[in-house]
Amino acid sequence: MGAGENFCYTFGVLDALDVSGGRIVAHGWVVSLGEHPITELRLAIGDAPEGSVHREFLPSPDVAKVWPQLPGTGHCRFSLQVEVGEEQRRRIASREVISITPWAGDMPGVPLERIFPLSLGAAQAQESCQVGGGDFVEISFSFLALFRLLAGLRRDESVLDAGCGIGRMAFALGHYLDAQARYEGFDISDRFVTSARERFRPLPNFHFRHADIFNRMYNPKGAIRAADFRFPYEDRSFGFAFATSVFTHMLRGDVRNYLREIRRVLRPGGRCIATFFSLDAEARSGIEAGRSTLAFRHKLPDGCLVTSRRAPEAAIAYPEPDLRQMIAEAGLALEVVHPGSWPGRERFLTYQDVFLLVRE
């Protein structure tokens, strides 16, 4: 598995971005995960490139301390101040995406993106910890960048968020999607859905539903089996769907049903980004060598591997051939797999393995 034909693997964080006094000010860090180092950062506002804006990086011992396994983290910080004119400020005010793209040699990497200003309230750290932790805003916009990069997500699309939680992925979408778009999210936690509804109250085209689905970890009193759940949407309703950190907590029958349902509600040509813990040779090697953040050592009768027999839904992995078979049986085409960092890989897109699926 490797990067896409049009980009290379890079990894970084946009710590802060502000637009004031006629300039864009941005701070963050980024490293190359490939053979070539990052040589420059290029700025774009919407579809309009603004050119190269940065070529020198600053010492970053703080990054190296947190990410010692990544190459180049000792000298990867950037601090930008870019003058913007009236037309550029107009595009920013109309919620055009501000992208800072690292370039390694002649290949672009994964963009660092924001929309300014933010108009929705972000979750506080205590609430965000309940859905995986991390910086709520940064994680949301990092996935918006992937949705745009991998699936070409447009601003006017109909979007399904299977497993929406408190609306972490929806947060960036709430700034990106326009009034003609439609967002639908569902989650098995009534408390999470209530929180999301409150946060997105200003957006009438964003809808959140509670699905009372049984899960031993997250909804032990649920009335519906995930393997029997029918998504509450009409056939061919969406152009884009995603399920992040959903299949990583699901047993085989549940995975099969959700894949079939995703196919049912997607229009022909519709795309889906789904994340998994996929066991290929490199992942198995990482587990055996102790490099992996998760040790999938317990095999269940349905063929999946888990980290805990007592709480199997805490983290679930599947052999990659099994995932490919389930995807094909659901009537979806697997376009590409981008590896995750979880088993200690040196080249990755994000933490979990990212699958791009298409309904043909």
Residue ranges and their predicted role:
Residues 1-118:
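Basic, ligand-binding patches in group-transfer machinery
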Residues 256-268:
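A short glycine-rich, Lys/Arg-flanked "PGG" loop and its adjoining helix->strand segment in the class I
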Residues 242:
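A conserved beta-strand element that flanks and buttresses the S-adenosyl-L-methionine
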